Design a protein with these regions (language model features):
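Short glycine/proline- and charge-enriched loop/turn segments
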Residues: 130-139, 186-193, 232-240
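C-terminal helical subdomain
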Residues: 148, 195-238, 245-255, 260
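Short, solvent-exposed turn/loop segments enriched in Gly/Ser/Thr/Pro and often Arg
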Residues: 176-177, 223-229, 273-274
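Pocket-edge positions in alpha/beta enzyme catalytic cores
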Residues: 12, 41, 196, 242-245
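Hydrophobic alpha-helix feature that most strongly marks membrane-spanning transmembrane helices
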Residues: 164, 189, 213-216
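Rossmann-fold NAD(P)H-dependent dehydrogenase/reductase core
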Residues: 1-186, 260-272
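Short, highly charged low-complexity linear segments
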Residues: 129-131, 210, 215-218, 242-243, ...
Length: 274
């Protein structure tokens, strides 16, 4: 909503069109002048994702800010349309593919940014390249959630390194909302017990908005609440786990992700596309 209030053209790219329409109507009810529309986007389906990206690019001249904010958290065991574990497939691979498709459109903007949303749960994530989807193992929903958010953070950091190496004007940053009261945690017992003390959704979005817009955000790659346990408070520089900053593993993750989505995410080549 804050983007719309400030006069930005906002595209709500959502899988659930009922929720997207409700959000659009709430924004317009409070700010009739807002320029906002919806776009059907299912990050759990690579073909549908590509179609949505193509539709967006055909209807716009450029993209100033991409916020990779879709998320699935500790659901019952399930897979994406492409057979990936749902959390890794949606939270990481979906954003990986979407960013690749939209990169040429971002390069057309004057000061473009990408913000990939991670979580304080990334600290418990472990990459198991031999079995990232946990096939043949007892389903560990928290383990997969931690893995997906660790992958998000590593992807955002590695993307920025590759963009800088290619001489792009695009900046890739990361953020997390802390402990926010949103429906993302609806499968969590902790949410049902402690949601009354969680940050509001708007406060949880503050670090993401900061990373997307503020000049000062360029001084650090990862932003989140700066208060107790990094779960509450106003935006501050967020701590990254040692695993998140492992550049060799980030390169392995990139190669693995390319293999999973079925195409090369070659930054220089994508930036050269018109």
């Amino acid at each position: 909503m804050e983007f719309a209030v400030k006069g930005a053209e906002v595209v709500l790219a959502c899988r659930n069109q009922t929720k997207a329409t409700n959000a659009l109507e709430r924004i317009r009810a409070r700010h009739p002048e807002a320029i906002v529309r919806t776009l059907g986007l299912d990050l759990a389906n690579l073909n549908a994702l590509k179609q949505a990206a193509d539709e967006f690019m055909a209807s716009t001249s450029h993209l100033d800010v991409l916020i990779n904010n879709a998320g699935v958290m500790i659901p019952p065991k399930s897979t994406t349309a492409d057979g990936f574990e749902l959390q890794v497939g949606t939270n990481h691979l979906g954003h990986f593919a979407l960013t690749a498709h939209l990169l040429p459109h971002l390069e057309k903007a004057s000061e473009p940014r990408i913000v990939t949303v991670s979580s304080i749960a990334h600290t418990m994530g472990r990459l198991r390249f031999e079995n990232m989807h946990g096939e043949g193992r007892r389903y560990d929903k928290w383990g997969h959630y931690g893995r997906s958010t660790l992958a998000n953070l590593m992807f955002g950091l590695e993307l920025d390194r590759r963009l800088k190496s290619a001489g792009s004007r695009i900046v890739s940053l990361c953020g997390h909302p802390g402990y926010a009261n949103t429906s993302l945690q609806r499968h969590s017992l902790m949410w049902r017990l402690f949601n009354n003390v969680a940050l509001s959704a708007s406060r949880g979005a503050a670090p993401i908005l900061y990373a997307a817009t503020e000049p000062g955000a360029l001084n650090h790659p990862y932003w989140g609440p700066g208060g107790p346990l990094a779960a509450w408070g106003w935006p501050g520089q967020a701590r990254m786990s040692r695993a998140a900053t492992n550049k060799e593993d980030a390169r392995r993750l990139w190669a693995w992700s390319e293999e999973q989505v079925g195409f090369a995410f070659d930054v220089p080549s994508l930036l050269a596309l018109d």
